A protein has these predicted regions:
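PAPS-dependent sulfotransferase catalytic domain
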Residues: 1-172
Length: 172
C-alpha cells in the first residue's frame, strides 16, 4: 500500500472572459454528493446533464435542466444571483462547467464527469452556435456588468479562418 498522499487537482488560475467567471467556484459550498459535469463548450454538456437528470429524477420527463443544473461559471447571471439559487437546491446537485481543471475548485468528496470531444469536431459546433445565435445572446454577454476582455462578436463567415483563430487562442 502506498504511503503517498493523493495529489488532488489544485486551482492555479482564474479565467475571466466574455463568457466565464471562474471565481464563482471559489465561493461554492460543496456538498458531499455534488456532481460536476465538465466539458469544453459544445462537447456534449447538455446531453450529459440530461442523462444525469434522468438518473437522479427516475426518468421524469420535461425537466428544466438549465435551471436545476446551472452553468456555474457563466457570467450571466452574476454569481451573486446564481450562488444563492444553487445553495437553495434541495435535490442532489449536478453542476455544469466549461473550465479546465486548473481553473476549477476541486472537492474530493464531489463526483466528477468529464466529457471529451475531438476539437476538429467541436470547432464546427461552436462556429455554428455563434453564427446562428440571436442578438440577445450577444447583448447579454457584451452588455452585462463584469465583462473582462474584449466583447464577443459574430464569427467570420470563413470557417477555416475561425478554426485558425480558435487554435491561435487555445480555444478561449
Amino acid at each position: 500500500m502506498s504511503t503517498h498522499a493523493i495529489a488532488w487537482p489544485r486551482k492555479t488560475r482564474e479565467i475571466h472572459n466574455n463568457h466565464m467567471d471562474s471565481t464563482a467556484w471559489n465561493d461554492l459550498v460543496f456538498r458531499d454528493d455534488d456532481i460536476v459535469i465538465g466539458t469544453y463548450a459544445k462537447s456534449g454538456t447538455t446531453w450529459t446533464q440530461q442523462i444525469v437528470a434522468q438518473l437522479l429524477f427516475n426518468g421524469k420527463p420535461d425537466l428544466p435542466v438549465a435551471e436545476i443544473s446551472p452553468w456555474l461559471d457563466l457570467r450571466v447571471p452574476p454569481k451573486a444571483v446564481k450562488l444563492p439559487m444553487v445553495e437553495a437546491q434541495t435535490h442532489r446537485r449536478f453542476l455544469k462547467t466549461h473550465l479546465p481543471v486548473d481553473a476549477l475548485v476541486y472537492a474530493p468528496t464531489a463526483k466528477y464527469i468529464y466529457i471529451g470531444r475531438d476539437g476538429r469536431d467541436v470547432v464546427w459546433s461552436i462556429w455554428n452556435h455563434f453564427a446562428n445565435a440571436n442578438d440577445l445572446l450577444y447583448q447579454a454577454l457584451n452588455d452585462t456588468p463584469g465583462l473582462v476582455g474584449p466583447r464577443i462578436g459574430r464569427p467570420p463567415a470563413d470557417i477555416r479562418q475561425y478554426f485558425l483563430e480558435w487554435l491561435q487562442f487555445d480555444g478561449y
